[in-house]
Amino acid sequence: MVEKAEKNNTENQKMEELLKIVQQYTEDDFQKIISEKKDFFFLYHLSPMRRNILEWYPFKKDAKVLEIDAECGGVTGCIADKVLQVTSLENNDLQRQINECRNSKKENLRVFTGTYDKMENELERDYDYIVMVGSFAKAPDYFADEKPYHTFIKSAFNHLKDGGEILIACDNRIGMKYWSGCQEELYSDYFIGIQDYIGFDNHKMRNFSKKE
């Protein structure tokens, strides 16, 4: 418990530093900052490579998009550059501030603090796309029933217009990095995703294989 608390404190300190960075510098400076920091935390949150996950996708230019769990906005800017309107949700208010600050010039973007389950009744029901980058695994945090992932998808569909799409990006639980000995990102343990989370109940977060 002490180790976990120390880890959380360290991450909060880095988040506060990240907020100062996006307040004082532009995206043109981020690569230099990443090189100086030599820390995966800053690489993950500041690298323009994060855009690649959706840069290729043919969004309709007049589209409305809901982004669930936007984190610090590493992907948000990419979406906002491609569509008419973006609504982003982020549970952590500090991360929401970072997102708003780094994307402050995006006039088509609104960012709110709150989890999907708490905000769901306030959301519109005519989005063209709903984007879940890393958030689908958190379904058990939002829904306490026996099939939280099914419930999450069904709930999200209620906020799409006819013909709308849900875009999901999450770790492949049997991806090569896990066969190579990397820790499972949700639990910082080894091979549990490859073993299909044996012993876990439906109320634990998990990742999926491509086939799943």
What is the meaning of each model-derived region?
Residues 147-165:
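A short glycine-rich, Lys/Arg-flanked "PGG" loop and its adjoining helix->strand segment in the class I
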